[in-house]
Amino acid sequence: MEKFTDLNYTLSVITLMNSTLHTILEDPGMAYFPYIASVLTVLFTLHKASIPTMKIALKTSKCSYKVVKYCIVTILNTLLKLAGYKEQITTKDEIEKQMDRVVKEMRRQLEMIDKLTTREIEQVELLKRIYDKLIVRSTGEIDMTKEINQKNVRTLEEWESGKNPYEPKEVTAAM
């Protein structure tokens, strides 16, 4: 019988809450009620989730200040996101991490520029050497009597032993 009365009591509480919500929602001045309710729900959830988390973190952590600071920053960033802001709150540690990352990236870029500059200088020196070798130099007087390459061409009289080396010869094979 006690379970039945508990169930009856629970149902009456739910009915009372539903009727209260319906009367609030019917009022035209409460157009923002769903937004207010969602913000209150989020705040309540954050409160219920953050208190035990912070208690455990403070007990187990050696540096409680950093934990509290991190929890507060996280809660404020969540509220800012819910409000529609794109900006976030950052701690000095995060700023230092980002600055270290930026400095590391700048060093990497400078090393890359240094390597590329060295390569470009080497390429310019190589091109200068190639250009120096390709420069036309005057060799004095050029023999233009034979314009085409006929220095190795011989006539029948110029051949040794007077025979044409390109004529086919008879070849006999041994059996």
From Swiss-Prot:
Glycosylation (residues): N8, N18
Residues that bind Ca(2+): E120, Q123
MF terms in GO: channel activity; metal ion binding; toxin activity
Transmembrane stretches, start-end: 29-51
Presence of the UniProt keyword Disulfide bond in the record: no
GO cellular component: extracellular region; host caveola; host cell rough endoplasmic reticulum membrane; membrane
Broad class of the protein's primary localization: host cell
Topology in the lipid bilayer: Single-pass type III membrane protein
InterPro entries (alphabetical): Rotavirus_NSP4 (IPR002107)
Cytoplasmic side: 52-175
Subcellular location: Host rough endoplasmic reticulum membrane; Host membrane, Host caveola; Secreted
Superkingdom of the source species: Viruses
One record GO biological process: monoatomic ion transmembrane transport
Gene3D superfamilies, A to Z: 1.20.5.430
Family membership: Belongs to the rotavirus NSP4 family.
Domain notes: Binds 1 calcium ion per tetramer.
Function: Plays an essential role in the virus replication cycle by acting as a viroporin. Creates a pore in the host endoplasmic reticulum and as a consequence releases Ca(2+) in the cytoplasm of infected cell. In turn, high levels of cytoplasmic calcium trigger membrane trafficking and transport of viral ER-associated proteins to viroplasms, sites of viral genome replication and immature particle assembly.
Name assigned to this protein: Non-structural glycoprotein 4
Organism, scientific name: Rotavirus A (strain RVA/Human/Japan/KUN/1980/G2P1B[4])
